[in-house]
UniProtKB/Swiss-Prot annotation:
Annotated SUPFAM superfamilies: S13-like H2TH domain (SSF46946)
Protein role: Located at the top of the head of the 30S subunit, it contacts several helices of the 16S rRNA. In the 70S ribosome it contacts the 23S rRNA (bridge B1a) and protein L5 of the 50S subunit (bridge B1b), connecting the 2 subunits; these bridges are implicated in subunit movement. Contacts the tRNAs in the A and P-sites.
The encoding gene: rpsM
Renumbered residue ranges of the record's region Disordered: 93-118
Record-given protein name: Small ribosomal subunit protein uS13
Native source organism of the sequence: Psychrobacter cryohalolentis (strain ATCC BAA-1226 / DSM 17306 / VKM B-2378 / K5)
Phylogenetic lineage: Bacteria, Pseudomonadati, Pseudomonadota, Gammaproteobacteria, Moraxellales
Length: 118
């Protein structure tokens, strides 16, 4: 297994799919990385040599991935909560942030139902 950005990349998959195992790298970003390096997206990771893997590592290093990206996202949410703005309040109460209705749905965000005490 190749190791890129601190993540073990599966050898038996295509390079495009394998790169998506890195947090912050989706299909589009993976295709851009492989295009910049000059590797066909359908190439298996096991067929790549060390120089190609080093080139991929250099390209991935230009993006914010893994721990840095997670920290950035959590700091953005913390900033909204500290400001006390509408979005921050919704984050604090574990409710949907982007305007979805909560009368009937939003069970994923609200958590399991609580029984009524009569």
């Amino acid at each position: 297994m190749a190791r890129i950005a601190g993540v073990n990349i599966p050898d038996n998959k295509h390079a495009v799919i394998s790169l998506t195992y890195i947090f912050g790298v989706g299909r589009t970003t993976a295709q851009k990385i492989l295009e910049a390096v000059g590797i066909a997206p359908s190439t298996k990771v096991s067929q790549l040599d060390d120089t190609q893997l080093d080139a991929i590592r250099a390209q991935v290093a230009e993006y914010m991935t893994e721990g840095d990206l997670r920290r950035e996202v959590s700091m953005n949410i913390k900033r909204l909560v500290d400001l006390g703005c509408y979005r921050g309040i919704r984050h604090r109460r574990n409710l949907p942030v982007r305007g979805q209705n909560t009368k009937n749905n939003a069970r994923t965000r609200k958590g399991p139902t609580r029984p009524l005490k009569r």
